[in-house]
A protein has these predicted regions:
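Helix-terminus/linker motif at the lipid-water interface of multi-pass membrane proteins
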Residues: 57-59, 125, 129-174, 191, ...
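Interfacial segments at transmembrane-helix termini and the short loops linking adjacent helices
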Residues: 1-10, 224-257
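Membrane-interface junctions at transmembrane-helix termini in multi-pass inner-membrane proteins
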Residues: 16-39, 255-285
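Helix-loop junctions and terminal segments of transmembrane helices
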Residues: 175-198, 267
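Membrane-proximal transmembrane or re-entrant/amphipathic helices at the cytosolic face
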Residues: 356-412
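Membrane-interface helix-loop junctions in multi-pass transport and translocation proteins
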Residues: 30, 34, 45-83, 87-88, ...
Length: 412
């Protein structure tokens, strides 16, 4: 009975997400990623800034209503994102309806079309269900294993709540960019493959991998260095010890951001190559190891809750490495480690050094946390340009995809 408010609060999100996915797919098919990217940012920001106040007010009633407040915030964020997509779709639909039809094209019959859709969608759907299914298993596994590790149940509930409610919520914000990058790769690579344009396919794949590290590395290191400051800015902690443990969890968990970003990009590339089963299998293997490690590590008294981020790091590493191998195999491209990895890593290291020095020199406080975040963004952007991690040639395709969509041209 205590979970009923949560189920009622999250139930509308099921319908909202399905409708929004169809609209996102329409826009992505036109290689216009702006609506998808903005709607995802609306989702993630809404989950943080709407869910938290609702959880606060719900806590005045009971813990169950606090959890329901978080879930209701998710439904509200999905609803606002869907409303945005509907507005954009209505604006764009007239332009696409006005395009002349190709008289040589024969529309597919319902059965072949349905068969083709299912062959593409079933592996993608199963792949998308893997991580939520593992999270569902973890929700019961983590708490029980913390108790098995000798932690009092009340303390275990606090640890689990801070990890799942605080740490994972913050980690999900930058991963929205990873999903946007992945989704932008699918239509462009599929189009190049359909034309037999191997050069463009390899260039887009290389760009996607480069952007994964350009975006993922600074997010991982920046959040890791500023974990305590970011948590203090957004959340309230009853004791310094609670803040310390949560900051350590966030610092370790933030390293999964870059791994998740690369997994998403390589999955997008493979899906564009019509190899959508491969990322499903690699992620399934990673999640299986994650569940096993969670059970083993969290039950150890000396590791306990810290086993959860360690298991996540292992999960995405296991998924990432074979994905990279298959991308190289099926695209035929050579992995330019200097351009794809080393230059972004150098820019990130320089940013990290500046941030570490600034943390020592600047006073603590919410205002100074915002200053540190701004400093990290600005210094990384400067170092990325100076080291060549990001160039004008890299930005041009990104701006074309994210900056303006275009209707498909009629082929003669």
């Amino acid at each position: 009975p205590s979970t009923q408010p949560g189920f009622v609060a999250i139930a509308p999100a099921l319908l909202l997400v399905c409708a929004m996915s169809a609209l996102r797919g329409f826009m992505q098919g036109q290689q216009n990623m702006v609506p998808t990217a903005i709607s995802q940012l609306i989702e993630q920001v809404g989950k943080v800034f709407v869910a938290l106040p609702l959880a606060y007010f719900g806590m005045r009633i009971s813990v169950a209503y606090a959890a329901a407040g978080v879930l209701l915030g998710t439904s509200i964020a999905e609803g606002v994102a869907l409303l945005y997509m509907v507005v954009i779709y209505r604006r764009k639909r007239a332009a696409f309806d006005a395009l002349p039809q190709n008289p040589d094209e024969t529309p597919l019959a319902v059965r072949p079309l349905l068969k083709r859709l299912l062959s593409l969608s079933i592996p993608l759907t199963l792949g998308a269900c893997i991580v939520p299914s593992a999270s569902f298993i973890d929700s019961g596994l983590l708490l029980n294993r913390l108790v098995d590790a000798g932690i009092e149940r009340t303390s275990a509930l606090g640890l689990y709540g801070r990890y799942s409610g605080y740490v994972l919520t913050l980690i999900n914000v930058p991963t929205a960019l990873a999903v946007a990058i992945s989704m932008s790769l699918v239509p462009s690579i599929s189009s190049a493959m359909a034309r037999g344009d191997g050069k463009t396919m390899r260039r887009q794949s290389s760009l996607g991998l480069r952007l994964s590290f350009v975006v993922g590395l600074p997010c991982s290191i920046g959040m890791s260095l500023l974990s305590s400051q970011i948590l203090s800015l957004i959340y309230h902690f009853d004791t310094p010890e609670a803040l310390r443990v949560t900051a350590e969890l966030l610092s370790l968990s933030s390293l999964t951001i870059v791994l998740f970003t690369v997994v998403q990009s390589t999955s997008g590339i493979l899906q564009g190559l019509r190899k959508q089963r491969i990322p499903m299998y690699t992620l399934m293997a990673g999640v299986a190891v994650k569940v096993l490690l969670n059970y083993t590590l969290i039950g150890m008294p000396g590791i306990n809750i810290y086993g959860a981020p360690i298991a996540s790091l292992t999960c995405y590493t296991i998924s990432m490495l074979p994905n990279l191998w298959y991308v190289r195999k099926y695209t035929g491209m050579k992995l330019d480690l200097k351009g794809i990895l080393l230059r972004p890593a150098l820019a990130t290291a320089l940013m990290g050094a500046v941030l570490a020095l600034a943390i020592r020199l600047l006073p603590s406080g919410r205002l100074w946390t915002l200053v540190l975040v701004a400093l990290g963004v600005c210094t990384y952007a400067a170092f990325a340009l100076l080291t060549g991690a990001l160039t004008r040639d890299d930005l041009a395709p990104l701006l074309r995809r994210f900056g303006r969509g275009r209707a498909p041209k009629k082929e003669d």
